[in-house]
């Protein structure tokens, strides 16, 4: 097993809290069939970067609430994604039979909330009409049409929720920019962009929001780069681009 950091935020106690996915390999070789099995929470001193505490998250499930984290006004919002991307189903438009994402869940992003900075308490979940304690009632909140994989990251810019999604992860080429007045929508796609791969054997994946370097009219995202066979290490450096804030 290994642990994969997700989203995080400064808590009410002044510590940086980072959600972490516990990953399990069920096959006999690396990335043959990987499954997230639990969510953990790690508290870090933001000045010394020392780990203060680590424990099972208040929602410790494999739903991975904490995939993306954003605070706004009275609440901190925890977005969820199943993150099943190795050894599941073949990509529909590819001739390869290699198992990749789990198409039963990878388009869905749900959201929960806690009081602002209280990442140590059990969240409540958006069921399409109201917030509820029933995690099983949570509904997808990010647009899914034409998107097999939604590894969405969310931020608040100018009192609006901004969602950045590298559609279809390492199989896709488009990055969708959506904005909404609330953490659950309704979302409007205001932009689509493409960051070119660095070589014929390369791809791009996972667009993340960089919390610095933006102007009054733009914000910054970093796009990860990959080489299909993993040989060309210099291609791994992220591409950083500025994108417009919706008018």
Give, region by region, the residue ranges found by the protein language model.
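Glycine-centered flexibility motif
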Residues: 61-66, 74
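Short hydrophobic/aromatic beta-strand or adjacent loop that forms the aromatic wall/cage
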Residues: 204-206, 237-238
């Amino acid at each position: 097993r290994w642990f994969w950091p997700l989203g995080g935020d400064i808590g009410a106690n002044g510590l940086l809290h980072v959600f972490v996915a516990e990953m399990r390999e069920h096959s006999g070789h690396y990335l043959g069939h990987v499954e997230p099995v639990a969510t953990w929470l790690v508290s870090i001193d933001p000045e010394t970067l020392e780990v203060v505490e680590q424990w099972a998250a208040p929602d410790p499930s494999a739903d991975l609430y904490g995939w993306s984290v954003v605070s706004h006004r009275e609440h901190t919002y925890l977005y969820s994604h199943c993150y099943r991307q190795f050894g599941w189903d073949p990509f529909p438009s590819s001739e390869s039979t290699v198992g990749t994402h789990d198409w039963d869940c990878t388009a869905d992003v749900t959201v929960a909330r806690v009081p602002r900075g209280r990442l140590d308490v059990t969240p409540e979940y958006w069921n399409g009409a109201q917030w509820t304690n029933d995690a099983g009632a949570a509904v997808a909140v990010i647009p899914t049409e034409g998107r097999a994989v939604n590894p969405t990251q969310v931020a608040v810019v100018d009192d609006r929720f901004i969602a950045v999604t590298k559609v279809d992860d390492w199989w896709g080429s488009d990055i969708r920019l959506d904005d909404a007045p609330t953490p659950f929508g309704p979302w409007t796609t205001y932009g689509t962009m493409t960051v070119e791969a660095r070589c014929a054997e390369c791809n791009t994946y996972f667009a993340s929001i960089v919390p610095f370097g933006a102007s009054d009219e733009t914000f910054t995202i970093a796009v990860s780069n990959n080489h299909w066979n993993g040989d060309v290490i210099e291609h791994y450096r992220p591409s950083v681009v500025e994108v417009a804030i919706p008018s």
